[in-house]
From Swiss-Prot:
Cofactor: record remark: Binds 1 Fe cation per subunit.
Protein name: S-ribosylhomocysteine lyase
Single GO term (MF): S-ribosylhomocysteine lyase activity
Any one GO BP annotation for this protein: quorum sensing
Record key words, sorted: Autoinducer synthesis, Iron, Lyase, Metal-binding, Quorum sensing
Cofactor needs: Fe cation
EC number(s) on file: 4.4.1.21
Binding residues for Fe cation: H56, H60, C125
Classification via Gene3D superfamilies: S-ribosylhomocysteinase (LuxS)
Similarity field: Belongs to the LuxS family.
Gene giving rise to this polypeptide: luxS
Length: 158
């Protein structure tokens, strides 16, 4: 058993109120610079989760659409529990800024502007058969209807 303390394992998942964005941590690099890890929680932990096709499609859509809105995004990786994403950035944004960005991106996803899943071919995706644009759009609608909070424990909808 590892002795390393993993922040997400110390988070009381029964106390958070999804959807939200929160800063998990900012780490300084050994040669300067820093990266920040965010918790983009889209569904309430232990109550519901996004099926893999919808989550996988959101991942592909976020990859381009979020980077179109802000600089410094290194990676967006889905949580294994399928309730949201880690968002890694070399820019230290506050939670409210990122919540507004994800609201805007989700609004684009539900619009008629998004009609296909980017990079959903065998050459560009490791599981190209597991996508659902319909599911991604439906989840985006649900998340927008609930509102995205800039605080994990108190609803501060942006």
């Amino acid at each position: 058993m590892s002795e390393t303390v993993v922040e997400s394992f110390t988070l009381d998942h029964t106390k958070v109120k999804a959807p939200y964005v929160r800063v998990i941590e900012t780490q300084a690099g050994p040669n300067g610079g820093s990266i920040t890890n965010y918790d983009l929680r889209l569904t309430q932990p232990n109550e519901t989760s996004i099926e893999t096709g919808g989550l996988h499609t959101l991942e592909h859509l976020f990859a381009g659409l979020v980077r179109d809105e802000i600089d410094g995004i290194i990676d967006m990786s889905p949580f294994g529990c399928r309730t949201g994403f880690h968002v890694i950035s070399w820019v230290n944004y506050d939670s409210e800024t990122l919540a507004k960005v994800f609201k805007k991106v989700l609004e684009k996803i539900v619009s008629d502007e998004v009609t296909e899943v980017p990079a959903a071919e065998i050459e560009s995706c490791g599981n190209y058969k597991d996508h659902s644009l319909h599911s991604a759009k439906e989840w985006a609608k649900i998340i927008l209807a609930q509102g995205i909070s800039s605080d994990a424990f108190e609803r501060k909808i942006v």
